[in-house]
């Protein structure tokens, strides 16, 4: 089975939902450049509905958490400011341990917003969820089996194409996603702005611009996380139909077999896709029967927390 070409999926997603809507030049928008424009080209867009004065509702808990209402996964490529976002929300403190059975460090903390407590799990920085490294495997397994209430994907506003590859893969696993469009300060220094509203429309999930190092946009970020976690914002990701009829049938049949062998396993369709794509680790986990135990272990870790 041929490997899924994620860059092809990405290019398709970058085409606007209204494919006949003309750009300034009169042609249909088809590329990443439709999201990025110079500061002079960007139209002013005041937003009366944007959350303001929310800082007073945010309480940084660090690791002082005996229980929580929601689990939030923080995912992203390396060097996108993910740890800066984590530290800004949790109060510059991390609870560091190891992932179960792994040597990779795990950091988690928490914050309280509007009387609700959020546990934030900082996943290893990774470019993909296709599980070719231990970091990718950890991030993938947590998103597949940890059942986070919300997944925040931190992306670099200056390198959207590279970063949105991971975001697209996350959207294949879960609907409850918020895109944190970070490093907006650097984008401005380069004379660039990102049309986050259009990006949100085309992805089907909220997009929040931030500059975490300067605490810009974090109030809106926690507000949006809260809205998604409580169901006040319903995410409807625009997934690309990139599977052929034959592949769809194979995925459907294999998904049914997986669900029969591992009752209650979340995201069985993604597992089927990885098996068809030749994922050796996933295949071994299915053949040995370890997949069910892995799912239980990851879900338990999400609820209990990292070891001290």
Task: Label each residue range with its predicted role.
Residues 5, 50, 234-308:
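Extended helical scaffolds that flank P-loop GTPase cores
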Residues 73, 85-86, 104, 120-122, ...:
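Residue-level signature of catalytic and energy-coupling elements of molecular machines
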Residues 187-239:
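Canonical P-loop GTPase G-domain recognition
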């Amino acid at each position: 089975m041929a490997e899924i070409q994620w860059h092809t999926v990405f290019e398709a997603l970058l085409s606007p939902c209204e494919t006949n809507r003309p750009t300034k030049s009169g042609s249909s928008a088809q590329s990443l450049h439709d999201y990025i424009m110079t500061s002079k080209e960007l139209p002013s867009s005041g937003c009366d509905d944007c959350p303001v004065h929310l800082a007073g509702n945010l309480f940084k808990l660090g690791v002082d958490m005996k229980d929580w209402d929601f689990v939030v996964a923080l995912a992203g490529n390396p060097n996108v400011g993910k740890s800066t976002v984590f530290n800004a929300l949790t109060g510059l403190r991390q609870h560091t341990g190891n992932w179960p059975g792994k040597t990779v460090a795990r950091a988690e903390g928490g914050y309280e917003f509007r009387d609700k407590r959020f546990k934030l799990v900082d996943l290893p920085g990774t470019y993909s969820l296709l599980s070719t490294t231990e970091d990718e495997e950890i991030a993938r397994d947590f998103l597949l089996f940890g059942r986070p209430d919300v997944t925040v994907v931190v992306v670099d506003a200056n390198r959207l194409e590279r970063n949105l590859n991971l975001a697209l893969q996350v959207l294949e696993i879960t609907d409850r996603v918020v895109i944190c469009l970070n490093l907006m300060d650097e984008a401005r220094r380069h004379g660039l702005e990102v049309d986050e509203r259009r990006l949100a429309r085309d992805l089907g999930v909220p997009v929040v611009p931030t500059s975490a190092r300067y605490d810009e946009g974090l109030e809106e970020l926690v507000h949006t996380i809260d809205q998604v976690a409580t169901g006040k914002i319903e995410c409807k990701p625009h997934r690309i139909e990139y599977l052929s009829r034959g592949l769809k049938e194979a995925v459907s049949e294999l998904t049914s077999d997986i669900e029969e062998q591992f009752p209650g396993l979340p995201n069985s369709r993604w597992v089927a896709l990885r098996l068809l794509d030749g994922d050796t680790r996933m295949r071994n986990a299915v053949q040995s029967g370890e997949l069910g135990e892995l799912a239980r272990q990851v879900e338990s870790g999400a609820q209990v927390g990292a070891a001290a």
